[in-house]
Amino acid sequence: NTAGKEDEDDKIFRVNPVKDPQVTYYNFRGEVYPDWAKFGLTRSNGARGHQGIDIFALPGTDVYAVLDGKIVDMYVDKTGYGLNFYMEVDPKELEKIKRKNYKPKLSAREMDYSSNYNPDTMQIKYIRYCHLSKVNVKIGDTVKAGQVIAKTGTTGNASGTHAPHVHFEIAFEMRGRGLTNRVDPEMYFKIKNGNQMTKQEIKIQTEAAKTEWFEPKGYDIGFRDKSIFLEKKDDLHKNEKIIDKAKNDKNLKKAELKKIKRK
């Protein structure tokens, strides 16, 4: 009974990278394309790989440390992953939350591991968060599972997207071209696919897809205490408008709205 096995996996306590995680239902251009968000050869009709998973998040959404760990690298890639960082975790703790019965479901192009992965010699121990607008930690800091460590954004090549998200990776080496050194985050975290979302969740993503979400023009990286953030000259984020439109949907329950309400 596959469903029963999945239920057993669900009993394991996990801290998700954002609350109630779901894949982006739309792609960068605003087209319905949940496959675009997934790990594997899911881009350009299978010709190009995607080395993580895109989790829908309006800019400014809290990002959580999924396990205890240490911040080991952080930088800004204005033409790629924007403001991003790596966290090193205990491989044994990561293994404890692995979904033993998970199988890719949405597309035949999804993959579990990159082709260079050898489970006998390689330890999966890095977590990466990308396209952020603010980071509350610095390299060398230790963090606890459940700690708010960043805010989502649209920095790097996510600027102009119709599908705001946090790009989330799990890896056995920090660097790697394409899918190299990466594994499917869904083997560890349950992230809703398009066919698992509620009508309200799809409604919110549909409203978000009507907007091009640009990173603030002329931003600079600022430092204050332990916080790294984007100094915004023109804040083009429109979270409140998306929420207001969603409020007008008579079928949208208050409980669903709270999931995205800006803190």
List each model region and its residues.
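Short, solvent-exposed beta-edge and connector elements
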Residues: 68, 97-102, 125-136
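Conserved, short, structured surface segments that act as functional micro-motifs
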Residues: 85-88, 139-207, 211
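Long amphipathic alpha-helices with heptad-repeat character
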Residues: 232, 236-239, 243-253
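Polycationic, low-complexity disordered segments in secreted or periplasmic proteins
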Residues: 254-263
